[in-house]
Amino acid sequence: MSTTPNIGFISLGCPKNLVDSERILTELRTDGYNIIPSYENADLVIVNTCGFIDSAVQESLEAIGEALEENGKVIVTGCLGAKENQIREVHPKVLEITGPHSYEAVMKHVHKYVPRPERNIYTSLVPAQGVKLTPKHYAYLKISEGCDHRCTFCIIPSMRGDLDSRPIVQVLDEAKRLADSGVKELLIVSQDTSAYALDQSKENQNKTVFWNGAPIKNNLITLCEQLGSLGIWVRLHYVYPYPHVDDLIPLMAQGKILPYLDIPLQHASPKVLKAMKRPGAIDRTLERIKKWREICPKLTLRSTFIVGFPGETEEDFQMLLDFLEEAQLDRVGCFKFSPVEGAVATEMADQVPEDVKEERFHRFMQVQQRISAARLQQKVGKTLAVIIDEIDEEGIIGRSMADAPEIDGVVYVDNLSEQEVKVGQVISVSITNADEYDLWGTC
């Protein structure tokens, strides 16, 4: 009697990589493999790596090393897989290495070392939406792969290639399957969400296709309109500040997609932005933010910035602080510039000393924490829609429309009414308190 082969799986990195992991796991289950959470009984281990910054590379190499030590049969995929020589130098015993989104190659290698079972007992158990690594009530939906930008601090295009948008009908079909399976929130991800379909010819962008019996065009605005028809929360991430992003704001004001924009601005000094190869018209950005908020007063703006970029002077940094004060962003992440092997910025002159980076990082965070706290304080006394993530003996933990999972704050809810609630449910919460990150309230 043959036994079902076991595959161990390690997923590292960002939400885009998580989606790749879900795709591979779905194919493994469809082919009849059993997925297990341990090295000990695995016939083979797959490590889906990250290679964005040096610390991520180190984490990936350590994970590969642990898998080799504990199991011995390891296949590597993901972003770091694009640098096969670097992996082989450290771990020559790895069986096979593939780059990111190489699903077919991964499965081919799995079949080579662990033949698929003759009798597949799992096919009927694979859900229509595929295997998901997120809680049942939210899911990441990747709409494109790769990036056409060449930001000097980033090596993603060298690992994931140029922009490659998925067909709009394929994206919408997956979104509908997720919604039909009980997903209440879709998190739209890619390397550059606002570039969706721009890699296609004008003819293809304007070509009429049909979905749900209706004619649609192949572009981001149409995609968001159709996603908004599913009756669930739709949250946009990684939105590069193209001019047509302005056209998304009315959809948010109308309630078709969440009034939430994750738009990585990276800096505010024109000189630094030019060195980064990022858009540098910061005054125009402030004008757009003002206009967006006029159209959609409930808009939440999230952004990320880099301090200590090569050549950043105290004057440049002060421009960044001044921008924070004027823009009054709701949610902000800050990173100290980290040299990445292969990135143009790593070889630039005028590298900023680590102690200066650290000092600027703390000054940045002090300013933004004060701004964030003040903006959250404005929500005290209001009633917000909150999606429930957890329920325990201490109460409810959820998120408002302004909070993406894992990167933003949460809402702690005291269920004074003792109403029956469940994870994934959207409830009305009266906000009673706030700090610089989180909210507290009652229902």
Swiss-Prot record:
EC category name: transferase
Function: Catalyzes the methylthiolation of an aspartic acid residue of ribosomal protein uS12.
Binding site for [4Fe-4S] cluster 2: C147, C151, C154
Protein known as: Ribosomal protein uS12 methylthiotransferase RimO
Subcellular location: Cytoplasm
Reactions mediated catalytically: L-aspartate(89)-[ribosomal protein uS12]-hydrogen + (sulfur carrier)-SH + AH2 + 2 S-adenosyl-L-methionine = 3-methylsulfanyl-L-aspartate(89)-[ribosomal protein uS12]-hydrogen + (sulfur carrier)-H + 5'-deoxyadenosine + L-methionine + A + S-adenosyl-L-homocysteine + 2 H(+)
Annotated cofactor note: Binds 2 [4Fe-4S] clusters. One cluster is coordinated with 3 cysteines and an exchangeable S-adenosyl-L-methionine.
Keyword Iron on entry: yes
Pfam families reported in the protein's UniProt record: Radical_SAM, TRAM_2, UPF0004
Family: Belongs to the methylthiotransferase family. RimO subfamily.
Keywords for this protein: 4Fe-4S, Cytoplasm, Iron, Iron-sulfur, Metal-binding, S-adenosyl-L-methionine, Transferase
UniProt-annotated binding residues for [4Fe-4S] cluster 1: C14, C50, C79
All residue ranges annotated as the TRAM domain in the record: 377-443
GO biological process, one term: tRNA modification
Stored SUPFAM superfamilies: Radical SAM enzymes
CDD domains in alphabetical order: Radical_SAM
PANTHER family tied to this protein: RIBOSOMAL PROTEIN S12 METHYLTHIOTRANSFERASE RIMO (PTHR43837), RIBOSOMAL PROTEIN US12 METHYLTHIOTRANSFERASE RIMO (PTHR43837:SF1)
Domain MTTase N-terminal: 5-115
EC number: 2.8.4.4
InterPro entries per UniProt: Elp3/MiaA/NifB-like_rSAM, Methylthiotransferase, Methylthiotransferase_CS, Methylthiotransferase_N, Methylthiotransferase_N_sf, NA-bd_OB-fold, Ribosomal_uS12_MeSTrfase_RimO, rSAM
